[in-house]
Amino acid sequence: MAKLHDYYKDEVVSKLMTEFNYNSVMQVPRVEKITLNMGVGEAIADKKLLDNAAADLTAISGQKPLITKARKSVAGFKIRQGYPIGCKVTLRGERMWEFLERLISIAVPRIRDFRGLSAKSFDGRGNYSMGVREQIIFPEIDYDKVDRVRGLDITITTTANSDEEGRALLAAFDFPFRK
């Protein structure tokens, strides 16, 4: 079992119960899922780029990504409905905890000119979204085999009812928020 999950069960739950005066352990917010999304707009011209992006996402997450297709045609972007334009992975359970551990301890500190993550990226319901400009911050990606530097979106979905609860949950995991 992931160390971060054990840490959550042993220490974070009790800390948040006292901080927010919950009556039940089930009221304590928890991480539900982590979604990784990589939009590959250039895939319209070259389908091979989407395969490379999917391979990168597989290496990062340890799970095969779902190819996302365009919902509607947009003439300005030269895309038609049903064109493959990206890929996404939804992590839950053990893989989610392992990814969160790697994200906090290894990947985020490797971001260039890193001064902390914005605490304003909560959506109002305790879910946190962040963008990563380069996929090479993850140790699973071999720098020499990268054909092009791509970014990805990471969304951490929690059961928190407010941004304050979500922020307290992620801060308890030593999430590096900007002061």
From Swiss-Prot:
The keyword Iron-sulfur does not apply. One of its GO terms (biological process) is translation. Keywords: Ribonucleoprotein, Ribosomal protein, RNA-binding, rRNA-binding, tRNA-binding. GO terms for molecular function: rRNA binding; structural constituent of ribosome; tRNA binding. GO terms for cellular component: ribonucleoprotein complex; ribosome. It holds the Pfam family Ribosomal_L5_C. InterPro entries: Ribosomal_uL5, Ribosomal_uL5_bac-type, Ribosomal_uL5_C, Ribosomal_uL5_CS, Ribosomal_uL5_dom_sf, Ribosomal_uL5_N. SUPFAM superfamilies: RL5-like. Signal peptide: none annotated. Belongs to the universal ribosomal protein uL5 family. This is one of the proteins that bind and probably mediate the attachment of the 5S RNA into the large ribosomal subunit, where it forms part of the central protuberance. In the 70S ribosome it contacts protein S13 of the 30S subunit (bridge B1b), connecting the 2 subunits; this bridge is implicated in subunit movement. Contacts the P site tRNA; the 5S rRNA and some of its associated proteins might help stabilize positioning of ribosome-bound tRNAs. Part of the 50S ribosomal subunit; part of the 5S rRNA/L5/L18/L25 subcomplex. Contacts the 5S rRNA and the P site tRNA. Forms a bridge to the 30S subunit in the 70S ribosome. This is Large ribosomal subunit protein uL5. It comes from Enterobacter sp. (strain 638). The gene is rplE.
